[in-house]
Amino acid sequence: MRSRSGSGVRLDRILFMVEQTICSHQNPITALFANQKDFPGHAWVRDNVYIAQALWALYRAYMKCADFDEDLTKAKELGFTCVKMMQSILECLMRQAEKVELFKKYQRPLDALHSKFAVGTKGTVCGDADWGHLQMDAISLYLLTLAQITASGLQVVRNFDEVAFIQNLVYYIETGYRTPDYGVWERGDKTNQGIRELNASSIGMVKAALQALNDVGDLFVDGSRGSVVHVLPDEIEQCSAVLSSMLPRESFSKETDAALLGIISYPAFCVEDPELVSQTRETITQRLLGKYGCRRFMRDGYKTVLEDASRLYYNKSELQQFEDIECEWPIFLCYLILDAMYSKDDDAVEAYWRQLESVLVLSDKGFRLVPELYVVLKEHVSAEKAHPGTQDRVPGGATPFLWAQSLYVIICLLYEGFLLPAELDPLSRRLSVYEKRPPCEVQVTVLAESLDVQRELRAHDIHVQCVDEIDPVFTILPASALGQLLAKIGESKKLNLSGRPLDRPIGLLSTSRLYQIGNKFVIFTPQFMDSRRSHLMYDIRILTDEWSSELQYIYASWNSVSISGRPLVVLVITQGMLSTEGLSHFSNIHLNRHMKSTVIGAIKKINTGYLSGARVVMKDLSDFFRTTAVSKMEFRDKSAEDTLRSVAAEKVQFTLLTEDATEAKNEKITTPRGPRTLRRGESVKDRSAYTAVHKASMRHRSIALDSNDADLMKLRLAYKSRPRDLQDMDSTYQSPPPTQTPLGLVKEHSSGELRQQLLKTTRRGAENETTHRDLTAEQMNEMKADDLLDLVNETTVLEEQISIVHCLWMKFGPDYDTELGCQHITVRMLMEEVHTKACEAREWALVRLTAGLLKKQLEELSKAVTHLLVRQKQITVGIASKKEEVITCPKTNEELEKIMNRAYGDDANSFTLAQEIIVYLGSLVRTEPKLFLEMFRLRIGLIIQVLASELSRLRNISGAEAAETLLTVSPFELKSMIFSLLSGRLLEEYAEDGIHYSDTIRETRTGIGSFRRQIEERKSLRKSTRSVGGLEIPKEEDEDEEADEDDFQFGIWLRHRRIDGALNRVPNGFYAILWDTVHKMPHGVKINDTVLHWGLTQEMTRKEIKFALESEEALNRIAEPEYRELVVETLWLLGRLEKLVLLEQPNIPRDRPLDVDHILHVANQIFVDHNKHLETIVMECCASSNPNNTRCDGARNICKHFYDSAPAGEYGTSHYIIRALMQLYS
């Protein structure tokens, strides 16, 4: 008889260890495992999947190293056991199919699949609300393992019902990048309060599962197309973007977490950036690694001797007591060994192996067991806290801990050479971090909607095919049609499962490939090309800007989602994009010509081969057939051709309807908005009646920024320029027409001039209002519905029509039946019609008013909110510091509608304007994330105020006029202004021709951010501009100072501070430094009557996002953004002056909080006294000894010239703040 080889004996020894330490816990009927003494009979999905991985690894080792037939028998037995386990877990999940259907639609925690089941029955073991079941990582880990096992040749999925369920699990997890869950540790945030969070470890596992299922092909392992699972690449890319913004942080409450080891290495391998992988690994080893393993996260009280086991929740103040005595988990040494093996770091493998060997526990039979954790004994707590890492610990929890024991089996197989790391990764996921493919060129096909469009493009030397001219094998449909097709994939009548929810957006990457459906190849146009999605698409410049940014996005993202073939984007040019006449009787012909040139210019740029840094190729559709990515769609129980025909019959129209087309359509009636009922005539003849109607309408049109708004007064940007005669200015100035760009006229004015002009406008408005109020109110009360309807039938002027319909809306309500033309025509139908007219005419003020009254929600809003939130940018809507609604987690369209109604219920214009701004911010945070690096909360109300304030400064107009002008700005110009503010550029420097994004954003941060740049010190220029009795007092200056004076612009730093304050921008690392400051102050820090207590540092760690949000909450109570920014500068300097704080006896207040406002006022007084000594321009306001001179109008009694000082330099604000701090500490 042939003896066994040495390797065979060692492999048998590992198998025997598995049988004795792992398989002894297995239920013989269900093949599931239970391992928790506190929960007997409970089988956790996560634990069982890792056990399946260990059995699968042992199966592969025996298949590879078999000496005899009996070894193959052992291999088959291990393979069958592994498959049975995976099938049992699948059966447990399929018994809750109704939960999958509900969760797809609503993402409610109580609809989540359970995370543990009964070992013996595969049923549930607790109620929906009795456990933190929503664990995206557990379901994703199962799908990832299923894909890897299937790729190795073992078949787990047995029938098409199971395939449909797996497809629905994909729909279940694909929103994981925006779904807060309870995380790997099942208890939510670290206070154990049951608060769900976005967890990086969950998002990483979701991404890995989606990629693996996308790569595995068919689930039957036989090449059958019907068992293919479809994954949308956009969801993978969303996960990548969120991970990049979160790592090495785990969540809001956890700076980092050892669970991240599972996503940067085995088993997920979901992070492609090697620098980010290295940074995450180093963060974990530096902060969490100890002698016995890693702590799960900082201040983790689980199973420590100080934890009160009778309470599930912790008190916030007790978290600090767990610091330095957190339990250490040996399982993470296994993860570190696996990571070192896959990264081929032999030294690290040996070091971690020796460390792991030292913490293993020997069983009675001599087997090495991995305990769950190591605990500090109660008598050693004080010593451990005094000298972390010096005290011995004892094993705690389950021994062996099956999750850890399974990983130990895997590393034993790898360490002893039975398997290579690649053999546990048949999908080659590990290579993504090492193999970098260059960006893939984007293929673009431009098609003309009609022959007329084709001829017009040809006249500009652009040769494209018409839609009707493409090869019959191709079919072109809008993105919404793809959504309908996906809704049919995954359907199962037996399981009562539908396909993908129709309300989920279709991403750009998904529409950038060909789909083979039967004998047809279908191309879907991008979703932003679907017409009539919102009024934004009527601004063609927004559409062409979308072309640029989205093509750049495809160029940068395509290779990261592992799709074979190149992307293809089809753009359909419609008549509405080029026509200079006929869109509407109200159209702005000049604007239409500009639109036409914009579209043609964009196409010519695409044809050059480069667009915004992206490599693009423009050809006919048939030329790209062989190189384009193709995905095949098949439908169970249905003909592919029949399915395609049913969807194509419902397809959305591409074109923006012309007036004639709209008229023809309405003759046939009935559109959702009703028939066109406003007859053609002339202007209203009864001007007196119309005046009353118009004034009533105008009183309800203003946004929250009118001339009496205190916040706008505070936001007024004061500039000092050449003296001007106020009367002349008032008599000669004329407000520019609303259609002119807000960036056109640049004028400068002083604070006093602006305030006097603002007050004059207010007085004139008040006088006019008083004169006409009684008459207008009386006329309106006497008017009946028939009177207003007679007026609306007389006019063809859009402004007049909207004013009259607006009054009908306010007086009789939207559902009032006007009975126009003896038909059922409600006021809402009339409003829908004038809204469409306003869109066609590109009258943006009227568009926003009518859209707000109709409560129209932009389709892009929900997606934009999600883009911001998953990148940790919270949003507030409403009037700043008065009535703000905070959005902290992704919302459904219905929830967003309620929030917007609460915030802007009576303000139709702001209702629309705020949505537009959120959409633009959501677009920019995706394409230009560096613009948002220093922000945690975006306050839409303050952004609106700053935009209006900038327009007031640029055009030298009043607050009311600035608010009106802001409403007339086109969507593209509004996006340009927001981009300009975010990038720190001056609006007057900004060209209106386009948004020119750069591949890398220069660091042009303003305000306190300038401390990161070298700022040249220079003497105060205020000396040379001080006047006495109207005469300039010359000062002796050298030539360099005179040159500086020419360049100096008064008001520039005041403006920067207001913009930074409005955007909530802070320096990098600001909140960590603030944490240090609060931690050193016994009674905390007082900001604007709000105290950041010392106890916050006991509850939250230094770099915890929750602390940043608490601090942000205090700062946001400051109404004046420029004062907020000075407070930020003071706190920043206070935290940086470590030598002062570390004095032996610093004069820190021991009986009260440190008052930041007091420090600022002391610094201001030092500034005033210093400038009084220097006899600068401050002598004319705050430093004046003349009782007739009043103090300046700076916020919070701080001199406006102090606000207008640079942060650094001999005469900068930091100089005076430091002197004030010296007085405090000395």
Swiss-Prot record:
Q: Where is this region: Disordered?
A: 666-688
Which Pfam family, any one, appears in the UniProt record?
KPBB_C
GO biological process, alphabetically ordered: glycogen metabolic process
Keywords in UniProt for this one? Calmodulin-binding, Carbohydrate metabolism, Glycogen metabolism
Mark out the compositionally biased spans (Basic and acidic residues). 679-688
User: InterPro entries of this UniProt entry?
Assistant: 6-hairpin_glycosidase_sf, 6hp_glycosidase-like_sf, GH15-like, KPBA/B_C, PHK_A/B_su
- Care to name a GO molecular-function term for this sequence? calmodulin binding
Recorded metabolic or biological pathway in which this protein acts: Glycan biosynthesis; glycogen metabolism
Superkingdom of origin: Eukaryota
Biological role stated in the UniProt entry: Phosphorylase b kinase catalyzes the phosphorylation of serine in certain substrates, including troponin I. The alpha chain may bind calmodulin.
The record's family statement is: Belongs to the phosphorylase b kinase regulatory chain family.
- Report the protein name in the record: Probable phosphorylase b kinase regulatory subunit alpha
